[in-house]
Amino acid sequence: MAPDQSYQYPSPSYESIQTFYDTDEDWPGPRCGHTLTAVFVNNSHQLILFGGSTTAVANHNSSLPEISLDGVTNSVHSFDVLTRKWTRLNPIGDVPSPRACHAAALYGTLILIQGGIGPSGPSDGDVYMLDMTNNKWIKFLVGGETPSPRYGHVMDIAAQRWLVIFSGNNGNEILDDTWALDTRGPFSWDRLNPSGNQPSGRMYASGSSREDGIFLLCGGIDHSGVTLGDTYGLKMDSDNVWTPVPAVAPSPRYQHTAVFGGSKLHVIGGILNRARLIDGEAVVAVLDTETGEWVDTNQPETSASGANRQNQYQLMRRCHHAAASFGSHLYVHGGIREDVLLDDLLVAETSQSSSPEPEEDNPDNYMLLDDYLMDEPKPLSSEPEASSFIMRSTSEIAMDRLAEAHNLPTIENAFYDSAIEGYVPLQHGAETVGNRGGLVRTASLDQSTQDLHKKVISTLLRPKTWTPPANRDFFLSYLEVKHLCDEVEKIFMNEPTLLQLKVPIKVFGDIHGQYGDLMRLFHEYGHPSVEGDITHIDYLFLGDYVDRGQHSLEIIMLLFALKIEYPKNIHLIRGNHESLAMNRIYGFLTECEERMGESYGFEAWLKINQVFDYLPLAALLEKKVLCVHGGIGRAVTIEEIENIERPAFPDTGSMVLKDILWSDPTMNDTVLGIVDNARGEGVVSFGPDIVKAFLERNGLEMILRAHECVIDGFERFADGRLITVFSATNYCGTAQNAGAILVIGRDMVIYPKLIHPHPPPISSSEEDYTDKAWMQELNIEMPPTPARGESSE
């Protein structure tokens, strides 16, 4: 049971804001039964309104009007939060039929629409994806059994992975089924049979996902017409457990909305029964998901505040409206109030009041999101364009600062106090790790962060003796990963975007999770320690530390620890795989979850990616040699690189950022100018003439870059003015390429140093041999970009 004590959390004050539009068609007008989805795309924060009905009719069974199916539409309108301007969008492609009472969810810059009801009855059960980057509708087709047509259901993306659907009405009866689609593939619906106390079938409920993946279901109306006030959380893991929230909601309701503002779920409006809207202080209810309490939103009343409060109650009385949130701002649009179809847009800023004193099960009293914006613009693919859902839709999370999903307790931790009431806590000082079978490892955080990074170095920096661990469980706990990330992030934040470095220096190309290759390079050509060569030579790593290989965690944790130990000698810049958009697809997220447990692994992955957003983006050696991960693209200038602000979010920032992370030289010195690149939309290749002009314009002599597999480990371009270096051998287990580093002496002479792929075991034929250092299943499903100079088949 939730604690008895309550605390003040002032209900946010909503106000109607003035909006603008160029034509009557741009303005959505009065609307009900529609959806509102917040998305960051094309460098702007937008609210996307879809569907609904523009008319309402009298309901003979109720004193409240209902949606008129004659007025149902499939129009799309965008509201720019900054300019407050509405714009009608006209996406091309597989346009869904007009519908209302459908469900919408955001996945990257894709808005997913499912179900609803139109003039001829329930809409089809297909998922339609509105690709906001290309203004195009895509009908997502999957094989096997699918959710039946329905309306009045709930849907959202849980844990940035599962598309979850629950309940609704199929036109004949209220359903009680739960469905999930794994956006990582295979792309098929699974009808779930969750354990726990499963909620009853209902329609017109609300469903919202907390950032750590808990799917919250609130209210609704059941098959007998009873209005529900219960709340459930669905935890998407191996067991898929429904957990009821013990605290009693201020009021049962249906046809309401619920959106998160930080860790607090704001439940807005709705109907109490067929004759009455929710009103009074219950019109906006707030569930603190940290404590499991419905919080007290009332403040001491004066005559002035009392009048204002009554105005707020009246303003928020509505049903069949739409709502969305951007960070700490909540938006509500339209709906029905008695006999009025509303067209207003309301906004409120959530209170920053703190929670009560922390409980033992949440000692740091963590909060989530607050002012931060959780938006996911579309990524570039580091591989050739793919047609799968996951490749089209996965995207970079861009925000003012990455929110820490690990700050939220588990749903059991939030909603239960003791083992007697359903929650058995872990041993003090322990945390679940490894596979989902429930291994427990004691956290060793009595040591200082300084001791922690030394522990990492002593454990991992073994150039002569390192072998892949037989046990895949990672040796660091989540809290240790977090502490290490916090410490190294401070260092990166204080470094410039463009590093100014001296020679001698070693330059490393893409490593991609190949820890064995990194140790071989350290063993053959010196390693960064006092016993090695760190006292007389620096190290520069050009990015792409993670993905595709089996040991990305070892690589990034060692490099972070070395950066803490030798901040002036170890230098890291960012690659295109150092982003949520890329490494959620190409293996790093999977590795984190497999080796640290699904929950802690996901949180560690988020935390590491937060550090990636602060990595420098380029380096200058002796003011003569530019080092970047990708290239110069459309011929950027040094000043443009220096002026990129961090934290930086690829694909939502400038074209300069995209160019330095993604662009490549043309295939050979005979291909001049700027040409399209097969990696994806907006990516270019640059010819030798572009390189020469860039060097002359910026007073430089050479460019060093990584980003492409090259057969010999390094390759010259533009008459030797540009060198590509790639450090991982046998890329993805098929390329048979050498790995290399570039050692640059005090005389600025470059010495390539190579390692070659290990031969297959004597007992295996070359044709049958599988290089287990790479994620073979992933690399087969999503083949890598071919080695430079080779064409894809």
From Swiss-Prot:
GO biological process, one term: positive regulation of brassinosteroid mediated signaling pathway
Catalytic residue list: H577
Keyword Disulfide bond set for record: no
EC number: 3.1.3.16
Each Kelch repeat, start to end: 53-109, 110-160, 214-262, 264-314, 329-388
Mechanisms controlling activity: Activated by phosphorylation at Ser-764 by CDG1.
Gene Ontology molecular-function annotations: metal ion binding; protein serine/threonine phosphatase activity
Localization in the cell: Nucleus
Name of a matching Pfam family: STPPase_N
Cofactor comment: Binds 2 manganese ions per subunit.
Signal peptide start-end: none
Function: Phosphatase that acts as a positive regulator of brassinosteroid (BR) signaling. Dephosphorylates BES1, a transcription factor that regulates the expression of BR-response genes, thereby playing an important role in the regulation of response to BRs. Inactivates the negative regulator of BR signaling ASK7/BIN2 by dephosphorylation at 'Tyr-200'.
PANTHER family the record matches: SERINE/THREONINE-PROTEIN PHOSPHATASE BSL3, SERINE_THREONINE-PROTEIN PHOSPHATASE BSL2-RELATED
Protein name: Serine/threonine-protein phosphatase BSU1
Gene: BSU1
